[in-house]
């Protein structure tokens, strides 16, 4: 059970109440690597998203990315290796216990080099900034997958299991609080995190799913987990996936909070909206960015992908969500 326990009657009043590949609990069988679709980033290397004007991101790339170490995990079970980027908290003290967050990038990072998993956006770097570490000293790990590890048909790669053994090995090497391990990811990374919630129930204290979806019929277990699930209404597949999970929660009578707002609202307004959600005392939280609001002025959507690639960083900019994540414990 979660250490953060809410009163059931209060929840019911405050929350929205809703009436090699293998066949496995997190996806469907298949042979070979996952193909295109959202897991494959719909064929786009960067979705046409130019982030050079995001001065905060460019500063993070310059100041934070060099603080990560590129390491290699040797997996005894498969005889394979997996590179990963690791941030160790400054002044790490082995007598203290630290949370750990895993960020899984979208598949545009596959084949783009070991630095791109960090430089592609906010999702990997934000947790290691001085401001975030001052509040939440934490380990940050970003796997460097060499293949697209999930696809829109819910096929999944054995590299995911290697990455999980990597996380376990880190808990044995460093003083990591195993009650405060989190996973997040965008597109392929969010889909992988959905798969992990099924294949490794109870391992993570909380989840942050961004711009992604999974087979909702397999996600009943999320009714007992803590998460934020953030998509753009202009992302056809991710928004449909969110709607399907909401329908599942409704059918099961699960409680949750769901809000929609403009991604162009200022930071204070958006963080206040998150605070209003959290005041409902739900552990299952859904955010939808209003259609068109993840596009910058003059920007056009990515064809059939809509606002898929443009929505990710807006989710990771939500400070109140980041703070909430680190409050969660098993």
Residue spans for each PLM region:
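Positively charged n-region of N-terminal signal peptides that target proteins for export
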Residues: 1-4, 8
